[in-house]
């Protein structure tokens, strides 16, 4: 009745077709993707859904799915907390479709992200940048709630806390 196509497919065959696709075509006993029809599509990110009517051409869906698969596999070329930042950006943009997710992924550098675990450090850095003498005065050092200060500064600077409360993001 059908086959699942797992993406990304990192191996390209001599004829320019991906190995995963070649296997699917052979299993379905067809020559091209155009001879197939999409029955269902799923994404490993629960916040994204792929509408069956979103793509006119199945080939475009396969390429976009493959591209997103590469993005997730590469994790922003080792960028720390890539997936947290990416998922927060998806939420920030209220993104639920594949095409917009690819756009966000390719422009992820346009977003600033601060993990919730770093809020205290963020507050401390803001104070240091402002040249506050708090850190040189032992009496004042213990009197500042750096976590509360950091949260207030993040909100003042336009950051939004994601619904999982794991990080703050802004564009």
Task: Give the predicted meaning of each segment.
Residues 1-11, 168-171:
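Short, extreme N-terminal segment that most often corresponds to the first beta-strand
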Residues 8-12, 41, 149:
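Generic structural motif
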Residues 11, 15, 140-143:
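Generic detection of long, well-ordered alpha-helical segments
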Residues 13-15, 46, 152:
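Residues in flexible loops and secondary-structure boundaries
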Residues 13-34, 157-170:
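Short linear, low-complexity motifs centered on an aromatic residue
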Residues 18-137:
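Mixed-charge (acidic/basic) macromolecular-recognition segments
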Residues 121-171:
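Acidic, proline/glycine-rich low-complexity IDRs
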